[in-house]
């Protein structure tokens, strides 16, 4: 499950119209979400809140023999109040990554939003995608104290700058300076292709990542006005070099994904990937399929041409909807509205009601609208299963219990025919709306 700060960062990317699927780092994101899902390592409690449309806080406390915690702060120049921030209202699919439908590439454009209620004031508007900025810092409290900071800025509608800093405090009796590292990343996304340039102060590492989408250019007005794509084929590569340690790394990959569109010949959406690391001789293929809106499967096969070692992993996710009778609108007065409706319309039969047809029509439309929203935002839970070639099984259940988001992880690792290791881990998340 994503942390609250990660969810806010995804909301920032969505608010600024940044396509995170158009990146080589997201080439195998669908298979990784279904097969390499993260699990809680200990009993951990998260308390988070979007205090203002521009400011968010998060506190974490964990304990299993050793008490630790962290404090996080986030500031965004783009208002994020349009995104739900309470744990009872955030769609669980936003927090628990699963099968991810690859978005079709679009040409980045600059958009304007209203930042206050004065429509006639020119200063009431700001430009999204040009000067949008995000600051994020997390301080891990127990020794050794570690500070993680992130600076994100949209230089232009097609370029984004990211600076990540990690600093660790040294031993108490040591007088040496804290260990720190900086990772700078410049992304250039045109829709047709995406280039990322990286530099890390660790061993002076330089890197490049690129992704190319086959097909029409989304920047072309003629291509953008044509029929939507039914599939997408992308090719990418990455390369790294460190002059200090003489480290060289490279990889390349392909991705084919079908769109979830209404076509005369409808098929299940699926994603195929092929990645190759020439220096190490590693070859990996993945196949992910969404059999229904609530069921998805994925498999991965890896092979090394040098050592002849192989790996095979399979997994699936199953979503379960738990419908609630009433949905809280978040303003605390839904009970009053329900009482008024029951007093005005005590009889369900239309012939026994004294209301006019227009009133009945308006009420029915309002009820259908609320019912549709309730189905989209109703309480959900998901069960993820992963098994490898050694029959090591991992189960993860994520769901809601009242206002809490709960994760329960079950791990069974087989060491021999007679011995196995079983672990049960738990994490609780609670988001406030102050």
UniProtKB/Swiss-Prot annotation:
Coiled coil: none annotated. The keyword Cell inner membrane does not apply. It is found in: Mitochondrion outer membrane. GO terms for cellular component: ERMES complex; SAM complex. It is a multi-pass membrane protein. Keywords: Membrane, Mitochondrion, Mitochondrion outer membrane, Transmembrane, Transmembrane beta strand. GO terms for biological process: establishment of mitochondrion localization; mitochondrial genome maintenance; mitochondrial outer membrane translocase complex assembly; mitochondrion-endoplasmic reticulum membrane tethering; phospholipid transport; protein insertion into mitochondrial outer membrane. Component of the ER-mitochondria encounter structure (ERMES) or MDM complex, composed of mmm1, mdm10, mdm12 and mdm34. Associates with the mitochondrial outer membrane sorting assembly machinery SAM(core) complex. Belongs to the MDM10 family. Lacks alpha-helical transmembrane segments, suggesting that it resides in the membrane via beta-sheet conformations similar to those predicted for other outer membrane proteins and porin. Component of the ERMES/MDM complex, which serves as a molecular tether to connect the endoplasmic reticulum and mitochondria. Components of this complex are involved in the control of mitochondrial shape and protein biogenesis and may function in phospholipid exchange. mdm10 is involved in the late assembly steps of the general translocase of the mitochondrial outer membrane (TOM complex). Functions in the tom40-specific route of the assembly of outer membrane beta-barrel proteins, including the association of tom40 with the receptor tom22 and small TOM proteins. HAMAP family: Mdm10. This is Mitochondrial distribution and morphology protein 10. It comes from Aspergillus niger (strain ATCC MYA-4892 / CBS 513.88 / FGSC A1513). The gene is mdmB.
């Amino acid at each position: 499950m994503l942390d609250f700060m990660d969810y806010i960062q995804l909301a920032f990317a969505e608010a600024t119209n940044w396509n995170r699927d158009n990146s080589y780092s997201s080439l195998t994101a669908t298979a990784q979400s279904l097969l390499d899902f993260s699990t809680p390592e200990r009993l951990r409690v998260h308390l988070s809140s979007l205090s203002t449309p521009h400011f968010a806080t998060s506190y974490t406390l964990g304990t299993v023999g050793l008490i630790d915690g962290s404090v996080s702060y986030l500031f965004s120049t783009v208002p994020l109040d349009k995104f739900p921030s309470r744990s009872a209202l955030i769609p669980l699919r936003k927090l628990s990554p699963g099968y991810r439908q690859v978005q079709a590439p679009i040409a980045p454009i600059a958009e304007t939003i209203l930042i206050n209620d004065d429509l006639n004031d020119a200063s009431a508007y700001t430009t999204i995608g040009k000067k949008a900025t995000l600051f994020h810092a997390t301080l891990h409290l127990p020794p050794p104290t570690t500070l993680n900071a992130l600076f994100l800025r949209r230089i232009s509608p097609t370029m984004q700058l990211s600076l990540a800093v990690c600093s660790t405090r040294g031993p108490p009796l040591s007088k040496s300076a804290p260990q720190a590292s900086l990772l700078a990343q410049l992304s250039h996304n045109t829709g047709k292709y995406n280039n990322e340039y990286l530099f890390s102060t660790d061993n002076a590492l330089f890197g490049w990542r690129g992704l190319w989408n086959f097909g029409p250019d989304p920047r072309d007005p003629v291509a953008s006005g044509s029929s939507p794509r039914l599939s997408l084929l992308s090719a990418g590569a990455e390369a790294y070099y460190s002059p200090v340690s003489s480290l060289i790394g490279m990889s390349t990959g392909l991705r084919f994904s079908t769109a979830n569109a209404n076509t005369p010949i409808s098929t299940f959406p699926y994603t195929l990937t092929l990645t190759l690391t020439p220096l190490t001789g590693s070859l990996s293929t993945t196949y992910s399929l969404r059999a229904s809106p609530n069921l998805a499967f994925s498999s991965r096969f890896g092979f090394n041409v040098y050592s002849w070692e192989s790996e095979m992993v399979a997994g699936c996710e199953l979503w379960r909807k738990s419908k609630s009778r009433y949905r809280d609108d978040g303003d605390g007065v839904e009970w009053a509205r329900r009482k008024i409706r029951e007093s005005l319309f005590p009889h369900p039969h239309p012939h026994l009601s004294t209301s006019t047809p227009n009133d009945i029509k308006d009420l029915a439309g309002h009820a259908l609208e609320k019912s549709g929203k309730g189905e989209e935002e109703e309480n959900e839970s998901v069960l993820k299963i992963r098994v490898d070639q050694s029959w090591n099984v991992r189960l993860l259940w994520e769901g809601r219990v009242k206002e809490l988001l709960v994760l329960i992880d079950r791990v069974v690792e087989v060491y021999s025919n007679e011995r196995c290791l079983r672990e049960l881990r738990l994490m609780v998340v609670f988001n406030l709306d102050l």
